[in-house]
Amino acid sequence: RDLVRSRGLGDVYKRQIMKSIFEKDLSGEMVSPNEPGYNALIEDIFATIKVATEMNTGYRTPEEVHGYMGKILGKPLEESTTVLPPLYIDYGKPITIGKGCFIQQCCTFFGCGGITIGDEVFIGPKVNLITINHDPDPENRSATYGRPITIEDKVWIGINSTVLPGVRIGYGAIIGAGSVVTKDVPPMTVVAGNPARFIKKINKPHQKD
């Protein structure tokens, strides 16, 4: 049985156990469902999903969306950033979203491994940011490990793209629609495809190819 339940050690112990699990996720260590406190983690994830579901149900004003996002992230969403529901998110506290961002509808963020979104980032509809992977060993496949995603300033991610664990997308890069991003993307480049491959550099208006 889960130690949080069987010992009845209360909220302080629960927070300590959950902190340990989250730190393991963020540091890339393996996390097993058999670990003490794992049930507490699942409860917290479901609490986040509950808030996200409330936000996603029916029309919400921009002010209401900001209120819900503040609860999900555990910190205020920048006033200059726009999020269009529905947004599907499992855990928001390890997620940071910068200023002037625009996040379109039907995106999915798996945040346990950590997501950092810079300023003025455009994220198209149905984009998936996935920071968690499973142990490839079939005997231990229920165990997971996290790898952070970092999206630098002024990135544009096209519709229906997926960014996989551990990827950094450099300043000003463009991810073509429908791409699967499996490795780091250099600044000021366009990538596209599955897996995403280099297409071209982005030149400023006064520059020539």
What label would you give each PLM region?
Residues 6, 74-75, 182:
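Alpha-helix termination/capping residues and helix-transition junctions
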Residues 168, 182-183:
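Active-site/ligand-binding-proximal alpha/beta "capping" segment
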Residues 186-187, 192-195:
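Acidic, glycine-centered active-site loop in nucleotide-sugar glycosyltransferases
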Residues 87-97, 102-168, 194-209:
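Flexible, glycine/small-residue-enriched loop-and-beta-strand segment within the central core
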Residues 156, 174-176, 180, 188:
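A generic "structured core" feature
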Residues 1-16:
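Single conserved hydrophobic/aromatic residue that forms the stacking wall/gate
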Residues 14-80, 196-200, 204-209:
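Terminal amphipathic alpha-helical/low-complexity segments used for targeting or macromolecular assembly
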